[in-house]
């Protein structure tokens, strides 16, 4: 049996990153929702750093940015490159970028996979320019988060493979907000869930994608975004 939170699963399933009915389908839907929080570029040559970019699922929804994606997976990065992302292999806890270089930093579906999520957050804020935007999505450390993401989420079509998550790593929302504030970023949180109507249509083969809807509850899957205070 695989250990929980085994990153090797991403390599084993590398051919599924862009499959509309594969195990990463929901990641595609979440990426589209993530892009809604990315502002239009404010300057020519604006840089968007996409941390744990995987196969580059954010790329179709982003225009006008120099899109650089960082990931540890050697199998995912070529797919990101094929979709227009400049790939960098590296560790999200030790970013190989200078301070204050990025106009936008995105960290989607990765905080719940590291043991030091606040260190990842600090690194993301370090490379973000004053006035730049930070965009996150992750899973809350709650009973609902564990039930929806693991008990149900890892067993339904479009959900991730079993044992991909370790619920012990799910994110404390209050600690996340407080840590971001110490870095000069005041986060706004909102929940996300799939449209039930779209999901049923997707199951029936009548849709190729599912809209992710914003909710007031952040007890499960949630987004966070904020602007770094100018210095």
Language model features with spans:
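Conserved class I S-adenosyl-L-methionine
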Residues: 1-42, 135-157
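Class I SAM-dependent methyltransferase SAM/SAH-binding core
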Residues: 49, 54-94
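A short glycine-rich, Lys/Arg-flanked "PGG" loop and its adjoining helix->strand segment in the class I
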Residues: 118-130
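A C-terminal cap/extension of S-adenosyl-L-methionine-dependent methyltransferases
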Residues: 174, 178, 182, 186-231
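Hydrophobic adenine-recognition pocket in adenosine-nucleotide-binding enzymes
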Residues: 110
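Acceptor-substrate binding/catalytic loop of class I
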Residues: 138, 157-175
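A conserved beta-strand element that flanks and buttresses the S-adenosyl-L-methionine
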Residues: 106
């Amino acid at each position: 049996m695989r250990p929980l939170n085994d990153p090797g699963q991403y390599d084993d399933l590398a051919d599924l990153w862009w499959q509309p009915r594969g195990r990463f389908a929901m990641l595609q839907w979440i990426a589209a929702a993530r892009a809604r929080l990315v502002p239009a570029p404010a300057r020519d040559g604006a840089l968007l750093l996409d941390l744990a970019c995987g196969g580059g699922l954010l790329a179709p929804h982003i225009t006008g940015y120099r899109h650089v994606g960082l990931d540890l997976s050697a199998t995912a990065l070529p797919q990101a490159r094929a979709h227009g992302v400049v790939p960098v292999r590296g560790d999200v806890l030790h970013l190989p970028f200078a301070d204050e270089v990025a106009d936008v930093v995105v960290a989607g579906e990765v905080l719940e996979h590291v043991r030091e999520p606040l260190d990842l957050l600090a690194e993301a804020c370090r490379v973000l320019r004053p006035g730049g935007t930070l965009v996150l999505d992750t899973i809350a450390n709650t009973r609902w988060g564990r039930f929806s993401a693991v008990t149900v989420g890892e067993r339904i079509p479009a959900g991730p493979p079993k044992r991909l998550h370790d619920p012990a790593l799910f994110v404390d929302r209050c600690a996340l907000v407080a840590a971001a504030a110490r870095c000069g970023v005041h986060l706004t949180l909102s929940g996300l869930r799939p449209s039930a109507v779209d999901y049923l249509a997707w199951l029936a083969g009548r849709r190729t994608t599912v809209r992710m809807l914003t909710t007031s509850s952040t007890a499960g899957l949630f987004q966070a975004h904020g602007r770094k205070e100018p210095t």
